Amino acid sequence: MAKHQFQTEIGQLLKLMTHSLYSNKEIFIRELISNASDALDKFNYLSLTDEKFKEENWSGKISIKLDKDDNSLTIGDNGIGMNEEDLMDNLGTIAKSGTKAFMENLTGDAKKDSNLIGQFGVGFYSVFMVAEKVDVISKKAGEEQAYMFSTDGTGEYEVKPVTKDEHGTVIYIKLKEDEKEFLDKWRVQEVVKKYSNHIAYPIILNYTEEETTGEGDEKETKTVQKSEQINEATALWTLPKSELKEEDYIEFYKTISHGDDEPLTYLHNKVEGANEFTTLFYIPKKAPMDLYRADYQPGVKLYVKRVFITDDDKELLPPYLRFVRGIIDSEDLPLNVSRELLQENRILANIKQNSVKKILGAIKKLDSEKMEIFTEQYNRVIKEGIYTDHTNKETLLGIVRYKSSSEEGMVSLDDYISRGDSEKKEIYYIVGADEKVLRNSPLLEAYKKANIEVLIMDDEEVDSIVAPMIGSYKEWTFKDITTIDAPDSKTEEEKEEISKEFKPLTDKIKEVLGDEVKEVKISTRLTESPSCVLKDASDPMAGMAAMFAQMGQEMPEIPLILEINPEHEMIKKLDKVEDESLFNDLSWILLDSAKLSEGLEPKDKGAFAHRVASLATKAL
């Protein structure tokens, strides 16, 4: 019987379970029942699709045994079971668990952290909040040999061959002396009702009870073995909506989400006709921890006629809806459908299309308070959807929210349109990395003066790719204010006249700045600042941000255009400066200060600081 060391991360996790995550100990029952249910789902599928595993009288069940004399609790199932390799992979190493991700996402708040346990697939280890020792006895379906995995949670485990008649898994938990509450029938029943009432398999509680018979001298007390089913064991989504209360939906959500939080909203639909299916979807109040991980765990399980098929198919919903939790149950898909066939299956494509419309419809109907929560958690992935889902782009544009130059908080595009110019039908926006910099940008001055609202898109990494490809929404065209002329009351002739008048000055500044700018020209957008910079919209690279992002490469620098404000006192005086050194310094200050206003850095910060100090000294 060889002893093995737990991998480092699991050793740390065991220590954490034992000493830190003690505020919500009862969840170990939830996690072990959830694992048992998954094992039953897997065997149920095999028994229906593979002749080798057909069993005439098989009926999936989970058993819990309370033994007060032994101070132990046992949870068993007759599911698919595990062999030696499975036990070591699933319980002894990090390979198949989310241990590392779990450790990375710990907050230090014991209650919050205990709710993360199930989300990262490390639920088995929660048993060490209450266990002194654990034995996992398992026999894999179709194999002769059973194995026992044993550990006291201190860093070592051992696996040895044992005898077991039926396939499935039994987890024997020797409880710590101060955890006797989990030997109380009512306490265990309360936990099962709270977290696992709608697990689709019966949960049988085995316990002993003192019974007294007779009276007087014939009075006799004896210990009686009892068994009773303590959950409803119904697939909740198969019940008619009229029979379900909100509490039922919330209770079931807690079962599938491995947490205590209530969902933001849920939607339960049954579709009949040529393609029959039922869906039950939930939108969590808080985004899953792996929302932005490439290896995220999908949150939707696929069933065919109540038989579990998979919980690991990223094709059931589009990637931007990966935060959705729930169930799809089809009446028409074949039971033995392969992963490859799932991707091409017309029935599933129809279910997916219908599901997306229903989910987006439910999001659009959220009240303002819930919409605020949704936006805070999921606005970024909705933008992802705008970029990738052309079919539902218009609906997604109705959901996304942006900051605004005119309003506090986030605004919808419909809000913007309701306040905009219905003749021009234009939606103005500016993109950058810093909200404060964008709000103070000289590029906004003309829009503020004309009382025109501009959307502040400060998630540059995403907005710089998504915004340019939106095109329009409800026939309103998107306009990037850095690439168009600003609102101005001057005629074209007047603008041309001013440009001619200041051409010697703009040429001279360009000569000083050289290749640092592509062009220096008179601005129609500035009302307060002396200068501003913008990227050259005509540059071939300007519209290629998305392509470079997809290739994982940095965007090449786009040449800058420096615009100067002919109405500003500094520009008027600069036109009359004869001192070449002073003119050069002021020209560079015009460029560098404009760059700073847009969150860009001067080419030579030291030289910029020196010029400012020098001019300040002369002014004193």
From Swiss-Prot:
Region (A): 1-339
SUPFAM superfamilies: ATPase domain of HSP90 chaperone/DNA topoisomerase II/histidine kinase, HSP90 C-terminal domain, Ribosomal protein S5 domain 2-like
Domain of life: Bacteria
This protein's GO CC annotations: cytoplasm
Region (B): 340-546
Gene Ontology molecular function, alphabetical: ATP binding; ATP hydrolysis activity; ATP-dependent protein folding chaperone; unfolded protein binding
Record keyword rRNA processing present: no
Ranges where the record places region C: 547-620
Keyword terms, alphabetized: ATP-binding, Chaperone, Cytoplasm, Nucleotide-binding, Stress response
Main location as per UniProt: cytoplasm
Location(s), subcellular: Cytoplasm
Known function: Molecular chaperone. Has ATPase activity.
Entry similarity comment: Belongs to the heat shock protein 90 family.
Quaternary structure annotation from Swiss-Prot or TrEMBL: Homodimer.
NCBIfam families: PRK05218.1
Protein name: Chaperone protein HtpG
